[in-house]
Amino acid sequence: MDRSQEHYANGDQNLEANLIDHEVVTESSSSAVPQTENYKRWLRVSIYVIFVLFCQPLATILGRLYYENGGNSTYVVTLLQLIGFPVLVLFRFFSRIRQPKSTDTNFSQSPSFTTLASVYLCTGLLVSAYAYLSAVGLLYLPVSTFSLILASQLAFTAFFSYFLNSQKFTPLIVSSLLLLTVSSALLVVNTDSENSTNVSRVQYVIGFICTIGASAGIGLLLSLIQMLFRKVFTKHTSSAVTDLAIYQSLVASCVVLIGLFASGEWETLPSEMRNYKLGKVSYVLTLASAAISWQVYTLGLVGLIFESSSVFSNSITAVGLPIVPVAAVIVFHDRMDASKIFSIILAICGFLSFVYQHYLDEKKLNTSHTSAVGDLHLPVEEGHTNIQSV
């Protein structure tokens, strides 16, 4: 009996040791997986940030370069922001191959064809509207002024996110809205310093109003996309990001093409290319480069919304704010007076307020997530204690 009891005791100890080892291995592996996924997520975010920071300023400069050297078609500049979507088909194919198996346990169904068609149609129409308004604004405004006014999209994003995504108006966000508003107001009252031989005061005001409208359209679109990812695209995949970017650009391109032919501007394009100051080859390269830059920027923007939020994606857009005015001074010899410098400083301060608020939100979210994970381990420890007491 003593040997039998000793045998059973040794068996219980071995069983207990195996259970403890299994628990340690399971816990370490489960903690390693989220860490790996976190690294991959930040790698994707970094790529999207690079797309946004470099492609939007480049596309804006190229659009102005088209106007400065003999281009006159606002529909062409509008189309440049949209027509490059076939470039994303390759990215869509790549993301489908590399897409990891979903770990979502909600088993949510994919949106119906009718729902997807409605989403792509509505967002495409909105994209075509703000793209045309921004093309008109870029025609009548110096590129540095245009980029500074367009920075007010950050304020519009917060405004629309308040209604669509329950965005809270903290003191930092309110101060950011005020700074961005004052920054734009300085530019509208500074029309005399922007005097141009080719642009009248009325055209300047039209450009300002159109740019503000484009900024509001961008803010509405970004907030709407964030809501769609929360309520419609419940399966969070990179394919959903690229599909949205491709199909909304397809719809918007069709709308703008209809406008191009209906307005008769297409008839002037051959002579415009012949008379382009930099030559025919430069004409084609300028348009092609701008189209690709705009589409890569769109991919980065939608990707940041998918990985974080519309406010964060717009904040990253605002990081490139100083790039365009400085480049405009070098390339197009735009005036950089005291009021414009002060406007840049105010816009950057408004951007920093947004970024700091986002940092506080992320920190709070990570703290709550860590606390939740700690609570989940408590039952395991109690079960482990019960095993030891058997």
UniProtKB/Swiss-Prot annotation:
Membrane topology: Multi-pass membrane protein
Gene Ontology biological-process annotations: purine nucleobase transport
Family, similarity comment: Belongs to the purine permeases (TC 2.A.7.14) family.
GO molecular function: purine nucleobase transmembrane transporter activity; purine nucleoside transmembrane transporter activity
Species name: Arabidopsis thaliana (Mouse-ear cress)
Superkingdom of source: Eukaryota
Subcellular location(s) of the protein: Membrane
GO terms under cellular component: membrane
Pfam family, one: PUNUT
Ranges that cross the membrane: 42-62, 74-94, 110-130, 131-151, 169-189, 205-225, 244-264, 286-306, 312-332, 341-361
Keywords tagged on the record: Membrane, Transmembrane, Transmembrane helix, Transport
First-listed, main subcellular location of the protein, grouped into a coarse class: membrane
InterPro entries: PUP_plant (IPR030182)
Protein name per UniProt: Probable purine permease 7
Lineage per the UniProt record: Eukaryota, Viridiplantae, Streptophyta, Embryophyta, Tracheophyta
Keyword Transmembrane: yes
